[in-house]
Each structure stands twice: as C-alpha cells, then as structure tokens.
C-alpha cells in the first residue's frame, strides 16, 4: 500500500508509491482531507496489526509481540521517559492520544498501573483496541474513544491527570492546536508529555529510506527549540525535555544488546546526545 506524502503549502508535494517518491502537481490538500486520508491509512494498518492477528487467531498478543524485542524495548524506554518527565503516579487517570490499536495503552495499564483512556482518529483502530481490551479482561480498565488530536471533542475539560502521546503529533497538520487541546483536557497542575522526531537524527535525515522504511505522509521533524516554543505558545509551563534512543525499532534481536549500549553511552555524551532519535517534552498545565 502506497503512503501519500503532502508537504505544506508552497513546498513540493510528493506521493510515495511503494518506495519510490513521485513528484506531483496536485494542490495542497486541506487539513480535513489530510486527516481523512490518515484515518483511512491507519484503518488499513489496524486490520493487519499484531492486535488484529491476536483477535483472529486467539493467540496471546504478548506472545506475538514478544518476538519483536527491539520494538518492545523502544516502547518501554518511551513510557519510562514519559513517566519520569510527567511525574505520573500509578492509579492516575492518563489519556494517550494517537493510541492506534493500543500497544502503549495496554502496557501503561498492565505494566505501569495507570487508569487509561486511548484516543485515535482511526475508527478501525479503536474498534480493534476495544475488542482486544475485552479479550484481555481489561474492558473495565481501559476506555477507547475516536477523536481528532486538534479537537479532542470526545474529552471533557480537565478530565485527566495527564496526557501522553507517542509518534503521533508529527503527523498532525496543526501541532500547536493539538497541544492547546492537550492543555484543555488535563487538570490544572497536571502534565502533557509528547514525543517528537529529532530533526538532527541521522536515522530520519539519511538512513531511514536506505533501510527500506517508507516515508510517512505529513511526517515532520523538529528541533528542541521548536518543541519548547510550541509548548510555551500552547500555554504550558515548566517545560522540560530529554533526548533519547539511538535504537531503531527494526533492529535485529542479535544486535539489540549492542544498541542498548549505544543508547546508554549516546544519551549521556555531549554532542552525540543531540542526534538521538526522540525529543520528549513535558509541560505543566497552569494551576487554577
């Protein structure tokens, strides 16, 4: 399935067909058109996800995911960083925006003890996530809602203790609007934690396409300064961030120990740290 890529107005439009980008002269689509296209795209991915395979086969989703060691390590590193930056405590009510079929949401609930709500723009993703939660006995523990990050009409003001979002806001047409919505749905004093791909990471700049990983539509990369400014412009306070991960999710299991060592060294080495893959940022909702 080809993934369409549309860059912003006044810039080159590219449509990725398989792995070959083709220049087109089609007009820049509206934000709503991009989001509709994104919803359809993720509906397709959801139907082929590990969660869907688990529901179809009856196999334990943990056993399906267990073979993907690099991805599970990548996810846990992100979740632990979010927990640390957010100052979250077990049993708090968190919302994950861009939850897909729930791989992070389930782990945040079962492994880290949060009461979770998952939100995603893809109706098929939400359908599968709900079915999986029921099959795991988590139907009363996790709520899933369809929603748009830029609007979050499915969530009430101040309804959650904190918000997390992983690998999502990079595809949102208006990330500042999304952060303002994040501020709205989190209680005063709570924290919003969102990750962004680092513009200066070689993986995104040079290596991703060399390893056959398709360019995603609407994908954008950010500097730490841009991220900090967006959080401030959204009205979030006490902004702090960290840079982490040099390990791609496609890393073979045999190489994972070496990449974990690279993470350990790289994240602590001045200069090298600036090229880590992920900028994770946290901002506090002002107290009432």
PLM regions and their residue ranges:
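Conserved class I S-adenosyl-L-methionine
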Residues: 14, 18-88
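Class I SAM-dependent methyltransferase SAM/SAH-binding core
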Residues: 103-151
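Short, glycine-/aromatic-enriched active-site segment of Class I SAM-dependent methyltransferases
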Residues: 198-218
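A C-terminal cap/extension of S-adenosyl-L-methionine-dependent methyltransferases
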Residues: 193, 207-210, 229, 239-288
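A short acidic, Gly/Pro-enriched loop at the edge of an enzyme's catalytic core
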Residues: 150, 154-162
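Conserved beta-strand signature within the Rossmann-like core of class I S-adenosyl-L-methionine
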Residues: 190-196
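A short glycine-rich, Lys/Arg-flanked "PGG" loop and its adjoining helix->strand segment in the class I
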Residues: 176-188
């Amino acid at each position: 399935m080809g993934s369409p890529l549309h860059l912003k107005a006044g810039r080159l439009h590219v449509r990725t067909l398989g792995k070959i980008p083709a220049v087109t002269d089609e007009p820049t689509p509206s934000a709503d058109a991009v989001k509709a296209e994104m919803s359809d795209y993720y509906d397709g991915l959801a139907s082929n996800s590990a969660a869907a395979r688990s529901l179809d086969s009856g196999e334990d989703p943990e056993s399906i995911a267990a073979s993907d060691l690099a991805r599970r390590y990548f996810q846990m590193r992100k979740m632990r960083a979010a927990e640390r930056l957010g100052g979250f405590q077990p049993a708090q009510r968190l919302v994950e925006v861009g939850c897909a079929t729930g791989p992070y949401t389930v782990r945040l609930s079962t492994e880290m003890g949060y009461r979770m709500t998952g939100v995603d723009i893809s109706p098929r993703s939400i359908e599968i996530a709900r079915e999986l939660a029921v099959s795991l006995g988590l139907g009363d523990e996790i709520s899933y809602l369809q929603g748009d990050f830029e609007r979050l009409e499915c969530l009430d003001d101040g309804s959650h203790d904190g918000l997390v979002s992983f690998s999502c806001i990079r595809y949102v047409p208006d990330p500042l609007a999304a952060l303002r919505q994040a501020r709205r749905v989190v209680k005063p004093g709570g924290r919003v934690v969102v990750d962004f791909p680092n513009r200066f990471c070689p993986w995104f700049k040079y290596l991703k396409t060399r390893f056959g990983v398709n360019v995603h539509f609407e994908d954008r990369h950010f500097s730490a300064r841009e991220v900090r400014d967006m959080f401030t412009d959204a009205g979030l306070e006490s902004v702090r961030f960290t840079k982490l991960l040099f390990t791609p999710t496609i890393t073979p299991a045999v190489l994972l120990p070496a990449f974990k060592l690279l993470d350990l060294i790289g994240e602590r080495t001045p200069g090298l740290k600036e090229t880590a893959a992920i900028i994770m940022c946290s901002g506090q909702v002002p107290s009432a």
